[in-house]
Each structure stands twice: as structure tokens, then as C-alpha cells.
């Protein structure tokens, strides 16, 4: 049996551009196919699947092969609870070197005073942020007030009273329907809502944008300990100078969740008051969205919170993932390049172009457009749900996700909108011409979806249909785009049998 690697090397013989990264990647797949065939096959099938779809889910992207290779190594075998040079385990000097380099690179990239690179996800980073704020702003003063040195000195009664006090403090954050994330505390099913009293703020019903005067009114009313700014489905930028002033007026901590737009900050697209770094007390982010890194999280903070955040173990974490930290370091170094800055600007240019073509063809976008990497289409006038649109678009090779909109009448599962993003398509090299073609394909599909008729002659609320001729045309146009902009072109799919 001829191995994948042998076939790849034979095909690559004499070709320019053959590099160690693609060879190493194929060697890893080759080994898995022979040793664990079902796993190897599923990985290859996923590569084929991703190469056959336009990835327009705003929270997804493509990491470089270098980033992926940095994750697949023996670093995964090392336990390293603690922080660099202060571990609970011995023999961590090599992990220390990698994590320290990752930290310093993050600080350089964002211009931050401190960086913590261990969180396994954005949700973990957010949980660490709120725990750090609770520790610094509520627990610490309470322990000192009672005349103790540490929380372990409290009696059971005092500890119970402290937990009740923590639960009475207010955290003000964006609601889910207004573009916030479930970890912002306004969804009671999430652990964040169980730690403090979480109060939501909404977008303005007319503009569908955040109203700073209304946020300021709520801050004066509730006097929150924490003000959260950030979003997972909001197509405009935020003014962090204004938000900092609002927070300072009541002594609140300004916590910014920039998971979606971290790459736009790193790439110099969001500058001055649109850059949260100079204004926020704590900033959390993922590393796998616009940053194009591995799945994981980061916490950037002012010096006030540096010590408590670096004590994430035992605060709310155990052992970090050193192999992922290595991959984060690679991604952050990639983000320091001129090419990444060009990429970040192109992401926003592509989103604006996409929005313009949607609007020209009569689709309604939340907020009337976009200033960042994403846009949300209101499907109400088309008479279909976000779930139906998501399913039908997926069937023709376009990956989007259904999304709630303000005052959503359909509900959180089926939704009235879809969210689209340009980070992944921009990584493939697509530009304004391709965005016009993508918009045209999507509009034609959406306008031709009809509701499936049930057995009782009523219409389904969750299933739609698309005429086969429209579907075939859309698939062909999608395939045409992807043939010109293949994912990981250095990996020859013909060898992946």
C-alpha cells in the first residue's frame, strides 16, 4: 500500500513551493490513516468538507498549518499548573520559555500591560475575568474589613455572608438579543448569572445600535460593580472612551469582551476610541476568530488585576494546555506581520462590500450595515426563519448560522435572522469581486426558499425547500469560487484517498 506521504512527495517532485510544513502535515495524516484509520479518515473528510463550503460563520476562520503543527506534539504530555517560573510541578523550564514568549508576544501585539494566555476558551477567559473582579473588588475588601489575611481565615458564617454579598453586586452587560454573548450573564442557564446579579442593556429599538445615554442611565440606576462591553452578533464598533467614562462615573470595572474583533484591534483597524486596550480594566478574547489562531482564550488586564489573574490556578483553572499555548504564540507572531494588518483591513472592506450588495437587492440588515467583520440579515420580510435559511444555505455549500435579532418573534432556536462573517473567506484571499458574487448567490437562494407543506396541508415552520435548478446553480457557483481560492492549497487533495 502506497502511503499518503509517498504519493504526495511523488506528485510534488520537481514542483516549486514544496515546504516542510505541508510535508509534516501529510506525514501526520499518513500515520493516523495507517494506525487509526477511522480517525484519520474523519480528519481528511473534514478537510474535504471545509474545502467544499464557503465558511461564513463569523466566529470561524482558518489557522495556518504552522499553528496546527504547533499543537500536535509532546507538549501535551506536560502538566504545568501555575504560571511561568511559578509552577506546582517540576521540570517545566521549556513550557516556561514557551508561555513566557507567548505572553510577551501578546503584550507587544496589543500594547497591553499584562497578558494571561492559559484559558482554554473564550468562556474560560470570561469566567476568569469575573472571578478576578469578584476577588479584587468584593472578596479582598471584605476579608480586609473583617481583619483577616486570606479568605481561608473566615468562619463558615462569615463565608456564607460573603457569598451572599457577592451575589448582590450588579453586573451590567449586553443582552443576547442585542448581540451579547451567553457568558455576559444575561442568560440564566449560564454560570455567569449565578455569580452576581446580572442586568441586561439593550440596543435602541429604532437604530438597533447601543445607546450610550441609556447605558449611562442604567449605570446610574443600578450602580454596577462591572460594566461589560463587547458582542458576538453586533455589526458596529464601540466607543470605549465613552464606555470608560460611564463606568468611572459609578466606580464600575470596565470589562471588554473582544473575542470577535481582537484581530481587528491587532491589525490596526480599530484605533483610538475604538481600541479597548487603553480604556478597559480587563479584556478577554478568543484566539481562533479574527486572530486566526488555535481554539483558546486570552486575558489582558491592567496591573491592578495582573496578580489575581495569574493565580487562575487555583482560582478556577487547573492545568493549562502547553501545546495550545505554543500554537497561540505562533498565531500571535503571525499577527505582528504587515500581511496580517492588510488582512484585517480587507476583512472589514469585504464585510462592507457584502453588505452593500445585500442592501442593493432589498435585504434588510440590522443597524443598516456593518463597520466590522460581520452582518446580520433580518429574514422577517422573506417569511422564513434563520434555521430554515441556515439549513438551505448549508445544502448549497454556504455555512452561516441562525441568529436572534432584537425583539425576535420567532424565538431563540429558530430565530428571525442569520449572521454572516468575512474572516474565513478573506483568509482564502477573496476580495470585493468575490463578495459581490457571494451576495448574489445568497440573495437568489434566500428569495427562492419556500416553506415545506406538511401532511395536513399546513406549512412547516422549521423546514424549507429550494427548487433543484436554483440549488444546482448555487452549488456550481460556490464550487467555482472555491476552485479559485482553495483551502490549504499546499495540501493536494488528490493524494487524500
Swiss-Prot record:
- Cofactor list: pyridoxal 5'-phosphate
Residues carrying N6-(pyridoxal phosphate)lysine: 289
Q: What is this protein called?
A: Serine hydroxymethyltransferase
Question: Which GO terms fall under molecular function for this chain's record?
Answer: glycine hydroxymethyltransferase activity; pyridoxal phosphate binding
Recorded hits in InterPro entries, A to Z, give: PyrdxlP-dep_Trfase, PyrdxlP-dep_Trfase_major, PyrdxlP-dep_Trfase_small, Ser_HO-MeTrfase, Ser_HO-MeTrfase-like, Ser_HO-MeTrfase_PLP_BS, SHMT-like_dom
Subcellular location(s) per record: Cytoplasm
- Provide the family line: Belongs to the SHMT family.
Gene that encodes the chain: glyA
Which residues of this protein are annotated with the site description Plays an important role in substrate specificity? 288
Annotated Gene Ontology cellular component terms: cytosol
Question: Can you tell which superkingdom this protein's organism belongs to?
Answer: Bacteria
Question: Keywords, A to Z?
Answer: Amino-acid biosynthesis, Cytoplasm, One-carbon metabolism, Pyridoxal phosphate, Transferase
- What is the purpose of this protein? Catalyzes the reversible interconversion of serine and glycine with tetrahydrofolate (THF) serving as the one-carbon carrier. This reaction serves as the major source of one-carbon groups required for the biosynthesis of purines, thymidylate, methionine, and other important biomolecules. Also exhibits THF-independent aldolase activity toward beta-hydroxyamino acids, producing glycine and aldehydes, via a retro-aldol mechanism.
Q: What species is given as this protein's source? A: Chlamydia abortus (strain DSM 27085 / S26/3)
How does this chain assemble? Homodimer.
Provide the primary localization: cytoplasm
Reaction catalysis annotation: (6R)-5,10-methylene-5,6,7,8-tetrahydrofolate + glycine + H2O = (6S)-5,6,7,8-tetrahydrofolate + L-serine
Which Enzyme Commission number(s) are listed? 2.1.2.1
| Residues binding (6S)-5,6,7,8-tetrahydrofolate | 176, 180-182
Q: Which GO terms describe its biological process?
A: glycine biosynthetic process from serine; tetrahydrofolate interconversion
Q: In which pathway does it act?
A: One-carbon metabolism; tetrahydrofolate interconversion; Amino-acid biosynthesis; glycine biosynthesis; glycine from L-serine: step 1/1
PROSITE patterns listed in its UniProt record: SHMT (PS00096)
